[in-house]
Amino acid sequence: MIKFCKTCLNPSTRPNIKFDKNGKCYVCVYESSKKLDFKYKKYEWEKKNREIQSIKEWAKKNKTNSNYDCIIPVSAGKDSYRQAFYVRDVLKMNPLLVCNSYPPEQLTTIGAANMDNLIKKGFDVIIISLDPVVWKKLYRFCLKKHGNMMKASEMALYAAPVHIALSYGIPLMFYGENPAHTIGEKHGELTGDAIGIRKGNTIKGGPLNLGFKFTKKSDYFFYNYPSLKNISRNNLKIIYLGYYIKDWYGYKNAKFAINKGFKKRTDKPINTGDLWGFTGVDDDIRLVNQYLKYLKYGFGHVTDQVIEAIHQGFLTREEAIKIVKKYDGACSQKYILKF
């Protein structure tokens, strides 16, 4: 039987989730810590600011044969926009954006427009397009074998930018949020250190443990997360940027992105299983995958959204329950047939 966090709606079926002795998930524990007395909060954020400034200075001094201070993996989604502008305009760093692109027929029109808009804001972007034949075979295989057609592609989304950082001698890479703080999936430190991301539910084990028969090494190179030994030898730091931004929330990131020209979905939640239409707009297959997640684990993307809404005070737990019952796991047949 599924159990839920006592203060939000985080389910016990979420991979790698933990609850404390009071029945609270890591997200609620973290959010509670942000609401402590003013002096403590002020001290904590001053400490985080000193830490990210120190990381910035370290990166600028340790880049080798590169004009770039850091890499930011991007999809041109709401979080990508927030990270790119924060790193360039607030931290005053020179980032190289790395996008692991979908095959053309999979990329949505909105997704392409959002990427075009981001590039035009003055960023250098490397776009990696993996072999679409292998990509599609992996989608089909992962759906049948793992019930998650995006399992392999998510490996590439996380691994490919690390390969670029190592190849270009760029010492620092930023991911967005620590999953333990946003959805309660703990697979590493509860800090800004992102080296533990390789233990995440979807990407752990790597492509060679999928059960898929690759014909040559180049077929899986960008799906394979570099070893800790290789990362350490090249002195690469991997950081959760969201840990250092006080108002890092998906909804606020979306508002920021929209002000920069980001476009969101216009379809209704009953068709998409997405309350606000600003998540994963570059790919419609994600909607089907969230539906499958709902069938497997008993929760979908709406649950993730209301957890954040509860913490921001947009919804009460009781209101969130009604919304989840109405929209979670929704997916129009048009998206299923498109897949």
Regions found by a protein language model. Name each.
Residues R82-Q83:
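Hydrophobic positions on the alpha1 helix immediately C-terminal to the Walker A/P-loop
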Residues M1-D69, Y86-F339:
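Nucleotide-activated chemistry modules centered on ATP-dependent adenylation/adenylyltransferase
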Residues C70-D79:
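Short, glycine-rich nucleotide/cofactor-binding loops
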